[in-house]
Amino acid sequence: MEKWWFNSMLSKEELGHRCGLSKSMDSLDPIDNINSNENMILNFTEKSIHSWSNGSSYSNLDLLFIIGDIPNLISDETFLIRDRKGETYSVYFDIENKIVEIDNYHSFSNYWNSSYGTGSKSNDTHYDLYMYDTKSSLNNHINGCIDSYLHSQMRLDNYVLRDSDHYGDNYIFDDIKTTTKTNGRDKNLEVTKKYRNLWIQCENCYELNYKKLLKSKMRICDECGYHLKMSSSERIELSIDPGTWEPMDEDMVSTDPIEFHSQEEPYKDRINSYQKETGLTDAVQTGIGQLNGIPVAIGVMDFQFMGGSMGSVVGEKITRLAEYATNQNLPLIIVCASGGARMQEGSLSLMQMAKISSALFDYQSNKKLFYVSILTSPTTGGVTASFGMLGDIIISEPSAYIAFAGKRVIEETLNTTVPEGSQEAEYLFDKGLFDPIVPRNPLKGVLSELFRLHAFFPLNQNSIGQ
């Protein structure tokens, strides 16, 4: 663990908005961190740090809390807090596991209640802290503060305060410094690797997005609006009304039909490892549910499972879904995210293209039902050459990578240069390859309107059984 100290100074309005405090921060002294390599008997000497109550003026101060520091700060660390009465408290944070432990908790609780219980309360009752009389509620509040702070600060890289005589009333200044007895750069790298599962880097602008908040934003990058990859479960949750999802053929698994030989890892072992990693049996989830009350049959491919490759199980599940939708007169949605046919199953994977296309022919041409294909990044290979491009309406996500063969394969095979961006959704849209480009935010509403236009209306009851 590293030794941290920082001087945190917030205005009453700013702090009250972020963490629900109704008092200024001059009641708390600078916060220190216990280094695990140091003597645990600490000397709390006064530090010559300007307090907020000094009324000191600051000009052109850089906000040093940059995005790269956040993964280091939110590791499992122990901080020492000293109040204005001289009492000290040891607070241990494990943000990843949501653990907050307070040493000398009784004194800390008394100070907390005396400081914030009898004083003036904020105008917004949601932020009053006089109610916090249990460790559980305090833990929840602290975790809520951290989430709120990260949410509001994560897009800030370097912020320079404007020239003003009243910085104390309007701005936040966090000066975070690290001192360590080991190599600081190596230590930071170690901490970053340890907690990188808390952050997701945008593939387009390379900014970090806080994983916990990213899901609520439909996995759309805060900085550039790029649509990051989603799991099949997240897409189902995004599109299907809560409590209406009924999965189909969940127990269907591949049996290594051609006994594919691999020197690195047997096919069955690879399947098993992806099943454990994703919780899925194969690269597609199929089922029925309601979309804004409208009964639908939906299949969602998952790129996290062997690159969304299409084998015999994927082909069979989608075929059965199309046949079920045909028999029940349901609209059909297939969300594509695939690298193409699965080479470990040879020609059996290729024949899935014809099998699915045959089922869709009966669904569309004979039954005159409505099939919507949604292309996400990436959609390539055998999926593009079959059911991905057979929709009555073909929708693409923004900036999706859509192709039959990859850029490298084309260039090596044809000995020609593939123009940059020629396999992206916007370029292909101009060429008429599909219909609309729809972002994730309005997608559910767009699908609902399309279904209504084709005479599919919501049910009054919750069940979609016929």
Swiss-Prot record:
Zn(2+) binds at C202, C205, C221, C224. The keyword Lipid biosynthesis applies. A zinc finger (C4-type) spans 202-224. GO terms for molecular function: acetyl-CoA carboxylase activity; ATP binding; carboxyl- or carbamoyltransferase activity; zinc ion binding. Binds 1 zinc ion per subunit. GO terms for cellular component: acetyl-CoA carboxylase complex; chloroplast stroma. One of its GO terms (biological process) is fatty acid biosynthetic process. The keyword Amino-acid biosynthesis does not apply. Pathway: Lipid metabolism; malonyl-CoA biosynthesis; malonyl-CoA from acetyl-CoA: step 1/1. Its cofactor is Zn(2+). Keywords: ATP-binding, Chloroplast, Fatty acid biosynthesis, Fatty acid metabolism, Lipid biosynthesis, Lipid metabolism, Metal-binding, Nucleotide-binding, Plastid, Transferase, Zinc, Zinc-finger. It catalyses: N(6)-carboxybiotinyl-L-lysyl-[protein] + acetyl-CoA = N(6)-biotinyl-L-lysyl-[protein] + malonyl-CoA. It comes from the Eukaryota. Belongs to the AccD/PCCB family. Acetyl-CoA carboxylase is a heterohexamer composed of biotin carboxyl carrier protein, biotin carboxylase and 2 subunits each of ACCase subunit alpha and ACCase plastid-coded subunit beta (accD). PANTHER family: ACETYL-COENZYME A CARBOXYLASE CARBOXYL TRANSFERASE SUBUNIT BETA, CHLOROPLASTIC. This is Acetyl-coenzyme A carboxylase carboxyl transferase subunit beta, chloroplastic.
